[in-house]
Amino acid sequence: HVLSRRQRQMCIRDRVYRSLPEKWDIILSPDNPSYKDLPGVWVLIGGLWIAHFAYWGFNQYITQRALGAKSLPEAQKGVMFAAYLKIIMPLVIVLPGICAAVLFPLLETSDKAYPMMMSLLPNGLLGLTFAALIAAIVSSLASMTNSISTIFTMDVYRAYATNNPSNTRLVNIGRSTSVIALIIAVFSATPLLGSLESAFQYIQNFTGFFTPGILVIFLVALFWPKATTLSVLNAALTSLVLSIFIFYFFPDYPFIHRMAVVFFSSFFVCYLTSLIQGYTDSPKAINLKDINFATSKAFNINTAVVVVAVSYTHLTLPTT
């Protein structure tokens, strides 16, 4: 008897479910031990969207890749290629995690799943996977250090320098900043992340202190002409102070919920500050009429393909 594709999927799902029934949950209930990290349906309709737009839309770590393109069409091609890569993320991240949970159910921490799965690969494929991992790490470090050096050199050093520094001086300052940042990262990695069950969750929690304010700043700067310098500064301070307050005084409150609360609070503070200052259009406001938001026909078609592919994946995956 030859099983159909759907039947094979059901058989695999049933075997995995019987092996670890307690892990077969997509939407967690409030009594689940992991609810603090993945608070049920709010993961899909709550604060996760704030982290999403802040990272993919306004993080220099991402946007500098598009800004480095030689033309707008080339930048759009890069963004679209990244969208196609995101479609296969379940195969790259989720599927190996499910396999690790079945093959190694007694792992002490989730971070050990990846090296354990790597140990199952044959020599040739292991080397290829390791090379890809190193390339990804180097690429991420390059983008991160470039962001750090650019922000410090152009927005801090040059802005407050007593004299007019030359380009050579700025380049040297940027390089020194990158080296110092990497040294700090090396010596702080183990104390900050070494004892954690999941470094990824910690990083998301920590960056959640800043992302709501960053998102508010960029949104009002782009689409609200009445925003002022003081209003966005107050929004940034509200984001940091309120995040720290909730983190320490309500430690069991899910950080995704916290990001949503902080985002709307920061936006309200920004609005209130602008209202107190007179609620008039800022002379530095961006004129959106001068900006061309048009996209090419190929970009629109590929966008539709990505949306259909994601929708099809969710509709056809086996569910419990």
Question: For each of these PLM feature ranges, what is it?
Answer:
Residues H1-R8, I12, H314-T320:
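Single conserved hydrophobic/aromatic residue that forms the stacking wall/gate
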Residues R5-Q9, R13-S29, F53, I98-L103, ...:
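Hydrophobic alpha-helical segments and their helix-loop junctions in multi-pass secondary transporters
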Residues D14-R15, Y253-L315:
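Terminal cytosolic tails of multi-pass membrane transporters
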Residues K36-V41, S119-T129, G208-G213:
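Membrane-interfacial loop-to-helix junctions in multi-pass transporters
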Residues G46-E74, V156, L272-I286:
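Juxtamembrane interface elements at the cytosolic ends of transmembrane helices
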Residues Y55, Y61-N205, N300, S311-L315:
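Helix-loop-helix junctions that connect adjacent transmembrane helices in secondary transporters/permeases
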Residues L222-L233:
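Membrane-helix interface "capping/anchor" motifs
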Residues S231-L242:
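Central hydrophobic cores of alpha-helical transmembrane segments
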